[in-house]
């Protein structure tokens, strides 16, 4: 399926469009389309391009495929709604779809913890910590904090 992604930056007080960009591609390439749109907007706005180090960090902050991203975001939504049981199931599926995505493991650790399974929470927190190398410094701190917190409680 072909899709078109239109992104527009507007000055809301004046109602003027400052910059816009449109990219077209296949649904399977959605993440690449988002990256292309971001690059196009940066160029039009005169903002510096993303460095190779930043690009690695951005890619690490997202699951490697759409299905894993969907399941991860739905799992987070269930966690926020205090439905740890549904979150656990969705996050386990997200991990099956992308075993190397640190933040899915970290979120599953939170779900296990809320369900009272501290050993399972500890294992997922450890896994998240081991996979966190390419995350942004802020995300690394969150993952490390969760791991240290659950490790100290057990």
For each of these PLM feature ranges, what is it?
Residues 1-154:
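Acidic, proline/glycine-rich low-complexity intrinsically disordered segments
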């Amino acid at each position: 399926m072909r899709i078109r992604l239109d992104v527009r930056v507007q000055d809301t007080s004046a109602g003027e469009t400052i910059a816009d960009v449109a990219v077209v591609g296949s649904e399977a390439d959605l993440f690449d389309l988002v990256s292309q749109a971001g690059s196009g907007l940066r160029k039009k706005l005169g903002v510096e391009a993303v460095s190779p180090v930043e690009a690695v960090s951005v890619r690490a902050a997202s699951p490697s495929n759409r299905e894993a991203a969907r399941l991860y975001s739905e799992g987070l939504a269930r966690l926020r709604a205090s439905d740890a049981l549904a979150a656990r199931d969705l996050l386990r599926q997200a991990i099956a779809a992308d075993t190397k995505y640190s933040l899915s493991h970290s979120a599953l650790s939170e779900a296990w913890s809320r369900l009272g399974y501290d050993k399972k929470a500890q294992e997922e927190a450890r896994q998240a910590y081991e996979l966190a190398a390419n995350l942004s410094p802020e995300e690394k701190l969150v993952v490390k904090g969760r791991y240290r917190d659950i490790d100290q409680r057990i």
